[in-house]
Amino acid sequence: MNMLLLFLHEVINGERVTLTACSECVCPLQTSSSDDEYKCYCADTYSDCPGFCKKCKAEFGKYICLDLISPNDCVKPVSSSEAKQKMIKGERVTLTACSECVCPLRTSSSDEEYKCYCTDTYSDCPGFCKKCKAEFGKYICLDLISPNDCVKPVSSLEAKQNMIKEERVTLTACSECVCPLRTSSSDEEYKCYCTDTYSDCPGFCKTCKAEFGKYICLDLISPNDCVKPVSSWEARQKIKLLQGRE
C-alpha cells in the first residue's frame, strides 16, 4: 500500500483530516526547522508537489499540520478537486468553512450546531452536512451524507436563493452577521443584523454584500442606536420579529 493509500485509509478509519482550499492550506510540507513554516499544497496549484497530513488542527481560523508523511513520498501534484473526490469516495470528509456552506437551521440546544447545505463549487456534487460547527469564526462541516445521495449539483447562489425563499436565516462566513432578508434586486444584498462578538455593541447593517464567499457590511446604522451586545441567538430572534412586521 503506497503512502497516499495509507493516508486515505487512516483518514477513513478514524483520523479526520480537513481538506480545504489553498487559502486555508490543504496539505503542508515542513520546509524549515521552524514548526510554523510549511510548504503548502494549494488547491490552485501554487506548490509544485503536494504532501499529506495525517492530522490537521484548526487554529485561529486556519489549518496547520500536526503530523506529516515524508515529502519523499510525494509523487505528483494532485488538484484540490481530485483530492477531494478521492477522500469523498472513501467515506466521510470535512469539506470547507463558511464560504461553501449555508447554515440556516438551528438543530440542537447548542447555538453553534446547524444543519448545513454544502455548496462546495470545487466538488462535482455538493452533498449535505448533518452537522456544522462554528470554529474560530467560521463554520465547518462535521459529517457529510454520502455523495451518492446527492441528486444534482447546486450552486452557492441557488442554495442561498432556496434558503431565502423558504424564509430561513442564513448564517454566513462572517459569523457575526445574520443576513435573512432580501432588500434589493441584487442577489448579493441583504438586510443584516450584525452580531459581532468582537465589538462592544452589534449595530445593524442596512445592506450586506457577498464578496469572495463572505458577507461584508456596506452600511451601518450609528452605534449610538445600539443598546447592548446581543448573542447570535438573540439576533436571530430579533430577525424573526422584523420578518413578522413586514
Curated annotation (Swiss-Prot):
Gene3D superfamilies: Cysteine Protease (Bromelain) Inhibitor, subunit H (2.10.69.10). InterPro entries: Bowman-Birk_prot_inh, Bromein_sf, Prot_inh_BBI, Prot_inhib_I67_bromein. Pfam families: Inhibitor_I67. This is Bromelain inhibitor. Residues 31-35, 77-95, 107-111, 153-171, 183-187, 229-246 form a propeptide. One of its GO terms (molecular function) is serine-type endopeptidase inhibitor activity. Coiled coil: none annotated. Transmembrane segments: none annotated. Weak inhibitor of cysteine proteinases. Belongs to the protease inhibitor I67 family. Keywords: Disulfide bond, Protease inhibitor, Repeat, Signal. Disulfide bonds join 22-42, 25-74, 27-40, 49-56, 53-65, 98-118, 101-150, 103-116, 125-132, 129-141, 174-194, 177-226, 179-192, 201-208, 205-217. CDD domains: BBI. Residues 1-19 form the signal peptide. GO terms for cellular component: extracellular region. Each inhibitor is composed of two chains, designated A and B linked by three disulfide bonds.
